[in-house]
Amino acid sequence: TDAGVPAAIVAKKIKFNFGISSNYFLEIAKFRAARLLWANIVASYNPECLRDCDNKGANGECRCAAKMAVHAETSTFNLTLFDAHVNLLRTQTEAMSAALGGVDSMTVTPFDKTYETPDEFSERLARNQQLLLKEESHFDKVIDPAAGSYYIENLTISIAQQAWNLFLSVEEAGGFYVALKAGTVQAAVNESNKARHKAVAQRREVLLGTNQFPNFNEKAGDKQSVEAKCCCGGKDHTCEKDVDTLVFDRAASEFEALRLETEASGKRPKAFMLTIGNLAMR
């Protein structure tokens, strides 16, 4: 490396943190594609084994250095305040896809994090969700169970190609730091966030218990949405921003704001359904 540190040592010291979304097969393929790309990047540095090792390549390169260390965390984007126990289904699906994708460790977000500081009960459930995958489903006994699946293999290759092209375009523009300072990375992520919020609002993306099969009899009571308010992630403070920041609003935030406002007012809004055209054809 430029600092004179052997590439094998540097590669082994790097650990990646990923978020896990609710798209089951896509998430499995995402982690597989990430490992593939990282192995190719490390191989380009031709890392040398610094000790006697059986895991060497044809040219003597250290294959251990190409192993990607990944920690994953379930998403908060799709967590909801209302019908909060459905969050357990979301995080369990996400944890399962991450385990099948080959992550080394993971954090399962407690189901009540959206409206309170997680208590002992919700944290215990979050731990048990991982234990179920390990002790009941034996996910720790298999390596890359998705290998050979036509759908997942093709999805892996597709993600890897798209990610590599994006990586090259960022490098050609001056690198990630330049892109971060210019705000192009944040703009792309925020645009994706905006598109997903629109899809949820139009019910093109289903959020169970929010825009599909909501429980209208449920009352929020003392629940209040807990959202990060400043660029450093705090709730009640502001800080100066050297770069543009990301938008972390959850998918259900607009729906929840309407329901909380309605509940606080004590009056349900009325909607007039205007029928147009031939009723027999509807």
Which residues make up each language-model segment?
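Generic beta-strand/beta-sheet core signal
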Residues: 17-21, 71-75, 91, 108-111, ...
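Conserved helix-loop functional segments at active or binding sites
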Residues: 2-6, 40-51, 94, 98, ...
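Short, intrinsically disordered, charge-balanced linker/junction segments flanking boundaries
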Residues: 50-53, 223, 267-269, 274-282
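Gly/Pro-rich turn-and-neighbor structural signature
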Residues: 1-78, 82-86, 168
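Intrinsic disorder at enzyme termini
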Residues: 104, 136, 140, 162-272
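Glycine- and acidic
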Residues: 14-26, 74-78, 107-115, 141, ...
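Short glycine/threonine-rich loop-to-helix capping motif typified by GTGT followed
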Residues: 21-33, 74-88, 116-126, 151-166, ...
